[in-house]
């Protein structure tokens, strides 16, 4: 009785939560009765704690409404429901669309003696063992992506299939792909895990066509256990490649074989890609990987310095992190330059030394990101007038973008709160502080605000 009501509860949660929240937190749960207790199994500690903190009241309220005093007790546990041939999982009320081609994944692997043996190279060797979950620096900007990736590594082909990670360059998407691959291979050394850039898929298909080996190409890609494709946006306007990937995608998903894709944009925003593909990209879980916040940037620098055997003073790490905000790759490149200069000159790494070593990079960053530039970018994004940034108007359509611009100015520039207030029509520092706190709160509560803020960060940092 309680387990069947859990399915009804799932329907309630699906109505009340966003698609991403439902896919991320509710879909992976499995339910089983243990006496008078309904046990909800979560795939990992992160999901368990989140559901217990955020959704326990909604779940309890639903069961009380349906069963009154007979409502079961709830208990959370980590793992899979034991002795269950087919776990009761959270499934969407609306069924996934039927595949347009009902193709079973072929069992034969790609013939290395075919006319184009290079295409059948051991792609598993492309999984970089350096990239592990253990050395992925986690912060608010990427914790959902990491949690989803870890779940995929433990349960490939399960709830998050496909997993779609999107965000700007150098934010750690590729690191997570390799970490998942390493996790899958660790649990199953015989797993056929293929990682590649989307352009490699296109090149392989072109070679197969040239060598009359397209059937071998199809068999190879449809027989893998996990397929990870980086920068899927490069499929844009390549119609034949999209057609072939469409059928490969269908075959792999029908066989419960894991697919992970990355892009620099949200699936529906990718130009030049067929709607039927963009629709499929969103069937599983879509997660944004955002630019790292200050604390995460500092942690990345400290981790990188430690790996390089360098003692990086805290104040130096904060100095660099406050000025370079766009992506991890930029941070690591700057630190490598500092380390190289220190090794060459024999000088200690101090703030003054970093100013000198990164003089051109810091000057460029300060030139690119100004309060004026932020105001113009935000005004254009929200389709308001630049003058509204400085006006006293308090309507939400104007006040909210103004608050976003203030928060971005605090995060992306080195100006003080009073200086930011002056730039916004002579407002005082308490107004700026309130705006920063309000936007931080909305980023936690509103998916739209979170997306808008991330989009603006990417635009201003590019």
UniProtKB/Swiss-Prot annotation:
Residues 84-125 are annotated as: Domain II. Residues 126-342 are annotated as: Domain III, AAA+ region. Keywords: ATP-binding, Cytoplasm, DNA replication, DNA-binding, Lipid-binding, Nucleotide-binding. Residues 1-84 are annotated as: Domain I, interacts with DnaA modulators. ATP binds at residues 170, 172-174. It comes from the Bacteria. Residues 343-462 are annotated as: Domain IV, binds dsDNA. GO terms for biological process: DNA replication initiation; regulation of DNA replication. It is found in: Cytoplasm. GO terms for molecular function: ATP binding; ATP hydrolysis activity; DNA replication origin binding; lipid binding. Domain I is involved in oligomerization and binding regulators, domain II is flexibile and of varying length in different bacteria, domain III forms the AAA+ region, while domain IV binds dsDNA. Oligomerizes as a right-handed, spiral filament on DNA at oriC. This is Chromosomal replication initiator protein DnaA. The lineage of its organism: Bacteria, Pseudomonadati, Pseudomonadota, Gammaproteobacteria, Alteromonadales. The gene is dnaA.
